[in-house]
A protein has these predicted regions:
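N-terminal helical capping/dimerization or prosegment-like subdomains
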Residues: 1-88
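Active-site metal-coordination/substrate-binding segment of hydrolases
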Residues: 71-143
Length: 146
């Protein structure tokens, strides 16, 4: 695996293992665990990071790479960090194990949210951090929200 792929896999595994299960109640989700992981992952890039949400345990993270033209349109990379409840009987592996296994077409990460949508949330975070650390400046603002 190349470095960016490896970072994506590790971040995805961490997000899965945090068990941010949203059952539709205000007390569920605990997305702050994943927002904190993303804050740490994007930290040290010089980006302004903001965390907010309706309750202390239901936080989201926003980061922005400022564009060079304030009149240019912005682009938002948006994901979510919660998952729906699990019926353990329907799983052959631990749904919160984040296991990296050999699949038919190569390595696969198994776990709740691995394909909806923690995979995209983690890959966008890795790409966003890579752009930020290489000095990339888009014409319009580039925003990461999860």
């Amino acid at each position: 695996m190349n470095d960016l792929t490896g970072q994506t896999v590790e971040l995805l595994q961490t997000l899965i293992r945090n068990r941010c299960v949203n059952d539709g109640t205000d007390a569920s989700g605990n997305e702050t665990r994943n927002a904190d992981v993303l804050r740490q992952f994007l930290g040290g890039t010089g980006l302004e990071l903001q965390q907010f949400g309706p309750t202390p345990q239901r936080q989201s993270l926003v980061a922005r790479i400022e564009g060079t033209d304030p009149t240019a349109p912005s682009l938002c990379l948006m994901g979510h960090t919660d998952v729906v409840p699990v019926n353990a009987a329907g799983w052959t592996r631990d749904p919160f194990g984040g296991e990296l296994v050999d699949g038919p077409s190569g390595p696969e990460v198994w776990g709740r949210g691995a394909v909806d949508m923690l995979n995209l949330t983690s890959s966008m975070a890795v790409a966003f951090r890579h752009l930020a650390t290489t000095g990339f400046r888009p014409k319009g603002d580039l925003i990461y929200f999860a």
